[in-house]
Amino acid sequence: MPIEQCDKGFYKCYRTQLLPSKPKLTVPPVSFDKLSEKQKLVVRLVDNHLKGVGNQKNEQLQVLALGCAGAGKSAALLWVKKLLEEKQQQDENFAFKAVSLTGMAAFNVNGETIHSAFHINPYAKTQKQRMDSVIQAARNPDICKYFEKVKFLLIDEISTCGLAMLSFINKFLQLTHPGNDDKPFGGISFCFFGDPYQIRGIADYSAWEPLCMFLREKYGGIQDHYFGIPNCLFLDVSFRQSNETNSSSWYFGFLNRMRNLELTVDDIDKIRARMSCNLSAEELEQFEDCLHIFPLKLLVQQRNR
């Protein structure tokens, strides 16, 4: 019996959840006109590259967009992702990867975690074991065939990627793009977004460590590639505060003062006032459904019961 003749409720579920559908394009939170000049510059660099403006179609585009909280990194990233999605729909031989280290950050850009995208074994106990898992995956014929189409890499929260993580990505892309194994990230174009003041790679050397022979030899010169990115832009215009509430404006200002070691007595007093021991029972109830972060899986399981 044709599935269309089955229960209508089941068929609707089948159509909406089981059958493949055309992916929806990313919708940036603001129009292009409302972006700052540096945000527009990031987007135009990618747009011109994808269109081959200035005979740059076959050149490797390398962009590093840095900025503090509220500078509009996410808005610029989503505009870039929209351009990449449009290119992917128009060209069957073009694909891209949008990734981030943490699951939450990857979810926010509708992408993948770095471990998933580049087949890095998260349970490996040593960096050598992780690199071995990367090399093994990169030699898989099916994986290599897919990555032949991957021409662009988009990474959010680049500050969380230390030298080891960057070397895993670099090695994977070099192996899956034969002929470009001497080029950074296999010769594919990339655009990285992040804040160098934010959390650094866990159990890893920061990409911003001073250059030295030890790190160069240990991580295959990936730090030289990183410091050699030609298009490095700092988004320094406050983007969120123009349309946020007063409390949100203070919060983003607080984050920036904290990153610059410029906290005031008023900042510290406000933060102390929000400690759980200083909140009323009604205020504490408002946080019952908020995101809770715990250091141990056991505590997570206890919370979720």
Q: Model features per residue range: what roles?
A:
Residues 1-305:
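Conserved ATP-binding/catalytic motifs of P-loop helicase motor domains
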